Amino acid sequence: MKKENSETKEKKKHKFLKRLLWIGLPILVLIALIVPTNKYIEVPGTTEPVNQMITVDGKKDTGKGNFYLTTVQIAQANLAMIIYSHFNSFSTIYSAEDLMGSMDSAQYDLVNQFYMQTAQNTAVYQAFKQAKMPYELKYDGVYVLDIAKNSTFKNKLQIADTVTEVNGKTFKSSAEMMKYIQSQKVGGDVNIKVTRIDGKDYSFDGKFVKISTGKTGIGISLVDHTEVVSTPKVKIDAGSIGGPSAGMMFTLEIYNQITGKDLRNGREIAGTGTIETDGTIGQIGGVDKKIATASKEGAEIFLVPDSGSKKADDNNYLAAKEAAKKLKTSMKIIPVKTLDDAITYLETGKVND
């Protein structure tokens, strides 16, 4: 009798645990799917035709072939996404600090829009300069992107402020401004004037500090605030896409339109890379994901920055080749260091040394 009672209790216990498992498992799955973590996941984004974003003198490019910019998608990760990333070589997990530094998500998005605006202005400038056509580049100061902990302007400046003067001096470029600042002594007095997003002007006093490079600074991360006036007029509308990495592709599309040249020759050409005021093509993040999305969309050629470094972590070209090998794609990976390199390849098929 005792044995039967014991067996009955075991059966009831087994049934209870089974029910608990069936109830608990969906709850755990739901938690994994909807509860966010403090991590972010980066995965392949989209491949967007640039000719749909740019008008020159009110007209779009209707020629054969396309230039494409490429994006990554970043989202706050849940547990399921983190697990997924361990089995997908084209996804990366970042902490909030690694991704955004001291910024919140709203500030991060705003900064990326400033990067995009600068990329567009520099693209117009470089395309018209390359084509030897009339343009005017206006330097309005520098956008404040981040403020260092040791900056004496930490609780005075705001992200998105435009610094217009330092100690009563105005400048023609951020490089000129930084040269002046670096010539000053750490601990010396400094006054800066800024313009806020609302258009109001402010003046703040502080001290020069030693920054992470060991040089004198005021403790801010910055990007040029510029405007470009060109003839004919160029308009770029990239929607909600942010960041600087479409600079090269914008430049090629604008150059293609204003010169009447056919750089594409009917080809589907994707790429990534910043465009700098001296014509160099700068490194970007997430190049492996951009190779993945471009390959998926059928691009024939991918133009990618080549820093010259022998390490893939420091050279987009090497990282892109590794990604292409994993994907077994037939898409050609073409290294470029300057805008001239990109144009030369598209016109002749030759890669500059």
Report each predicted region and the residues it spans.
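Conserved PDZ fold ligand-binding element
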Residues: 153-177, 294-307
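PDZ-domain C-terminal substructure recognizer with occasional recognition of PDZ-binding tails
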Residues: 131, 178-222, 323-341, 345-348
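Second-shell loop/turn segments in exported
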Residues: 98, 105-118, 147-150, 164-167, ...
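Glycine- and Gly-Pro-enriched alpha-helical subdomains that act as flexible
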Residues: 278-310
